[in-house]
């Protein structure tokens, strides 16, 4: 079929949420002429649910996005109202940063960034179809009948795909926050042959700040110590005038109200059909699943400086409006609270992610990529991370360059994508530190060390950032080398000082790095014995030094495991492999292999239901029939 295109682009990104923004900025910055199409320009980078960025695992993803040259970290550093480091009492592998966002300012700043970006056109239009010829993307069709040519298309439609809002017995077609749903595109993705799933998520009510009795709640302030998501942000710019959050709880009265109205709850009445998130359940789901709990935490989170709206985190619900009001008024501090927006549930279509390659390109259609909630994930950060990788790979494909695949040992983003394409997901996927087997080397403090060079190689890290990275890396390397070369001797003067500090005296000579391995010895104490570095070190370098030195043994073991897995990842599986021709593989394994079509032995070994014997048989088969090569 011959198409008459009115405009032509290298890459078209459909949807301007957190995934779409990162995808379009990446492609345009890599030199591709890009169109970012959105149903509503006023909802670019909008936060339809929680007004925050980061948190456990997610905060590390934001730093990874930043290290690769993405925008989310920079944008939240310009627009937060509170910053807090989580899990400070735990090990370094699980520490992560979280920021309360001024949600309207966050969206405005991101829109400004997109509008001024070279090679990037921003357009309010609805895309109804993906145009495909001979198994390859050639463009898109708008709702008004316009056809735009493209060499690659990235679908980042969030919860808009056949979205339906549910509130009590009310159910109507809608995207998030009463925006338009994308129904025709959902129909046409299915017609293209993609397998479609149906998920559900929800959001809590918003209450008016001036109607809250804060005296009945517990204040939750931000941190005084400077922290940032972007490695380019300066401590001098750290916000002093932060806005606190507040903690309150449900109670028995709250639970009684919910239990008495479960028959009206869409989750239990049969109105909701989609699968909801395990790690962010609705309050009615929590009351039923955890009936023995006397109360549940609720955090009152301001949505910005210039609004009265307060997000009641932990109270996600689709109960009828009258029940929501009674529920709010049963909570300490909210007895007279004015509900400004009701909570609601939203159901939406997803592209089942086992149909994707690790580049986030669909296996079925060349040049078609998907990212974000479209792939079955939850969360702005997960979406942004996928959007960045999809955008990078769309640009690389257009330019005829080698693809970028982040491994599980490279980044949390790599863990997430591998989980999605290898295991799929039966519910909205959320990143957790427990999903990462190499989490000790995927920390928040070393994201730039892990990924900045990759960002530089693909063209997303500019000269200013690269210079700053080189300075930091050289300072780190030089100080580590110095600490590994200086010896502390067990002489009287040294041991007198050691004992004055309440520490165990030295019995043998010890290099400074070994001395720092003692749990009670931090960097400042160590250099008080051996003298300071040749130049002043930033607090972030000191944090990195302490972690790398104190956990060196564990880190080395993790790196040994990575090396073993790398050998598995290097063993490729031909794309044209005949799974039925492999004798002795278990039926379940054969079915999974056919469904997922793994690209490497490493990926095959991580598929649920595949055991080591199946992998051994597969490897023997490939060694005897290894002449075929995977083609993309």
UniProtKB/Swiss-Prot annotation:
Localisation per UniProt entry: Cytoplasm
Summary of subunit composition and partner proteins: Homodimer. Heterotetramer of two MnmE and two MnmG subunits.
Residues annotated for NAD(+) binding in this entry: 276-290
Matches recorded under HAMAP family: MnmG_GidA (MF_00129)
A GO-annotated cellular component: cytosol
Summary of the function given for this chain in its UniProt record: NAD-binding protein involved in the addition of a carboxymethylaminomethyl (cmnm) group at the wobble position (U34) of certain tRNAs, forming tRNA-cmnm(5)s(2)U34.
Entry's transmembrane regions: none
Keyword Cytoplasm part of the UniProt annotation: yes
Main localization (coarse): cytoplasm
Molecular function terms, GO-annotated: flavin adenine dinucleotide binding
This protein's UniProt keywords: Cytoplasm, FAD, Flavoprotein, NAD, tRNA processing
Cross-referenced PANTHER family: GLUCOSE INHIBITED DIVISION PROTEIN A, PROTEIN MTO1 HOMOLOG, MITOCHONDRIAL
Protein name: tRNA uridine 5-carboxymethylaminomethyl modification enzyme MnmG
Binding site for FAD: 15-20, 127, 182, 373
Family listed: Belongs to the MnmG family.
Residue ranges of coiled coil: none
Organism name: Streptococcus pyogenes serotype M6 (strain ATCC BAA-946 / MGAS10394)
Highest classification ranks of the organism: Bacteria, Bacillati, Bacillota, Bacilli, Lactobacillales
Pfam families assigned to the protein according to its UniProt record, in alphabetical order: GIDA, GIDA_C_1st, SAM_GIDA_C
SUPFAM superfamilies: FAD/NAD(P)-binding domain
Cofactor(s) for this UniProt protein: FAD
Biological process per Gene Ontology, one example term: tRNA wobble uridine modification
